[in-house]
Amino acid sequence: MKIIFDITIMVFLIPVFLFFFPIIYLLIIISDGYPAIYVQERVGKNGKIFKLFKFRIMDESSDEDLHEEHYKKLADKETIEPSLEPGNPIRIENDDRITKIGLFLRKTSLDELPNVINVLKGEMSTVGPRPLVVYESKLLGDYQKKRHSVKPGITGLAQVQGRLDLSLQERLYWDIEYVENYNIVLDFKILFQTIISVTVSYTHLTLPTKA
């Protein structure tokens, strides 16, 4: 059923990809030079490592270690637990590594458009927990296996709940909620909510709270 869902969505998403991809690619090259595509190793289903494709939104000379240091500081311990308790957001405030066009691409989520390539390669789904880099995945401890039991997605439940404004603990909570509550109807709701949050306004999906 998940494969049928992805194929159906790809029928509509590929024309969007073909239209916007060359435009954004050229804008990045003109504005910030090569490369326009950022390739990074991420953790996929069952812990398999794959190469994720995104549009580059940061200066080519930016310090990648800063991101890892930020995550470890947020975790404040070797592993994290899922929780809805408010915490420090994942987002790095006033991140001067992000380019001008990168700010627009991140705000509209168009930086994730090359993820379509990963979906076509069978490494990702259209909806699912976002693929993590290896050092992020290690922070999940015993929750790694459950979170990585499904394919990562272009968008997911955590993304429509707050994306980078969530804490690491909140994101893990919603990722686990998705895995435990997965169904096609939920996928359609998340997809619709993603479109709404990008193009109209930012609202929230709600799931029944566990007792």
Question: What kind of region is each of these model predictions?
Answer:
Residues T206-A211:
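A short, hydrophobic C-terminal helix/tail in secreted or cell-surface proteins
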Residues I14, F104-R106:
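Short pre-functional
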Residues M1-H67, I184, K189-L205:
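A hydrophobic, helix-centered structural microdomain
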Residues L18, E93-D96, D111, L186:
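A generic structural signal for residues located within well-ordered alpha-helices
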Residues I7-L13, K72, T79-P82, E112-N115, ...:
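Short low-complexity stretches enriched in small and charged residues
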Residues Y38-D96, T155-W174:
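Short, glycine-rich, amphipathic interfacial segments at transmembrane boundaries or analogous
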Residues P35, P89, R106-K107, L113-L205:
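Hydrophobic structural segments characteristic of membrane proteins
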